[in-house]
């Protein structure tokens, strides 16, 4: 048991930061960086797509739903593979692995955010839209100033669940050897070749603590925010 803990403590810096001191972040730090980067892209992207789907009917909405269902129906690991091979062809050069995975996570998550935000908008009383229009608001002002803030607050638990899944999905970066937490845990296990249970139990505990922390932060934010 003590020896298993020694494996963790001896490699703790590498598991937490990777080689950040030499400009190559890894481990927990890189997992958080990829999750944060993907969230920064996916959240506003998903909101914009949801607003377009809510505002416009017909071909625009059908095209957005088709795109979202296509993305959600494909395993994320395939999206990562596609990005890994297609982005260099599109950009004419190799991209950093962490950036490629971040873009894949953002693309995948934006579709889920779109559906969640759209559900929140559709759940609001329809009379609010007519009431805002009668007060002189335009359709765009009504959506952005009246409906969207309420919808986002109402779907906060859903968004938290989405971003918890996003954080856990960063572990799939191991498939293209991006040195996030799961990858470096595997590297440590391959190097020491003993106590794999201790290494991967530690990895699981770290993911659990990160996800619980995110959930608690969201709860605290929801409690302290004034009601709309």
Predicted feature residues:
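Transmembrane alpha-helices and adjacent helix-loop boundaries
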Residues: 1-228
């Amino acid at each position: 048991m003590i020896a298993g803990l020694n494996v963790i403590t001896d490699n703790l810096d590498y598991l937490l930061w990777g080689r950040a001191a030499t400009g190559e972040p890894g481990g927990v730090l890189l997992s958080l960086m990829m999750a944060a980067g993907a969230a920064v892209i996916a959240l506003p992207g998903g909101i914009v797509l949801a607003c377009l789907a809510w505002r416009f009917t017909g071909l625009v909405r059908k095209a957005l739903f088709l795109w979202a269902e296509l993305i959600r129906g494909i395993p994320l690991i395939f999206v990562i593979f596609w990005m890994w091979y297609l982005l260099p062809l599109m950009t004419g050069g190799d991209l950093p692995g962490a950036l490629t995975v971040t873009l894949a996570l953002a693309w995948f998550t934006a579709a889920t955010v779109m559906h969640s935000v759209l559900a929140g908008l559709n759940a609001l009383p329809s009379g609010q839209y007519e009431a805002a229009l009668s007060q002189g608001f335009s359709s765009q002002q009504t959506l952005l100033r009246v409906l969207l803030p309420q919808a986002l607050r109402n779907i906060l638990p859903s968004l938290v669940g989405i971003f918890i899944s996003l954080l856990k999905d960063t572990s799939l970066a191991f498939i293209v050897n991006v040195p996030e937490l799961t990858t470096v845990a595997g590297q440590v296990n391959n190097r020491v070749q003993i106590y794999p249970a201790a290494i991967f139990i530690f990895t699981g505990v770290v993911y659990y603590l990160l996800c619980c922390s995110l959930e608690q932060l969201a709860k605290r934010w929801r409690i302290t925010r004034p009601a709309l």
